[in-house]
């Protein structure tokens, strides 16, 4: 990953952490759903929240008709689905 990409990733993580106070965070409503790859469009890499492992994992998403537990980046998945006590 280039230094620009790393800087962008760091910025997104910081923004996510700063905008949403930990005590008031609620998990995205679809994070508890199983991954659904959808059924149309080209396959692309996306991320889903694995409730058993409590982490975001990559999977192949087909672009439509899946549920809401799919995110373009691991960072977005973590921002939406990880809730800290």
From Swiss-Prot:
Heterodimer; disulfide-linked. The A chains have phospholipase A2 activity and the B chains show homology with the basic protease inhibitors. Gene3D superfamilies: Pancreatic trypsin inhibitor Kunitz domain (4.10.410.10). This is Kunitz-type serine protease inhibitor homolog beta-bungarotoxin B1 chain, major component. Beta-1-bungarotoxin is a presynaptic neurotoxin of the venom. The B chain is homologous to venom basic protease inhibitors but has no protease inhibitor activity and blocks voltage-gated potassium channels (Kv). Residues 31-81 form the BPTI/Kunitz inhibitor domain. The keyword Signal applies. It is found in: Secreted. It comes from Bungarus multicinctus (Many-banded krait). Expressed by the venom gland. The keyword Signal applies.
């Amino acid at each position: 990953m280039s230094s620009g990409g790393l800087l962008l990733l760091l910025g997104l993580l910081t923004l996510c952490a700063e905008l949403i106070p930990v005590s008031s965070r609620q998990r995205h409503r679809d994070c508890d759903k199983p991954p659904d790859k959808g059924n149309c469009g080209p396959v692309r890499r996306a991320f889903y929240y694995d409730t058993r492992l409590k982490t975001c994992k990559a999977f192949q998403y087909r672009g439509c008709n899946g549920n809401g537990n799919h995110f373009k980046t691991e960072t977005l998945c973590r921002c939406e689905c990880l809730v800290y006590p």
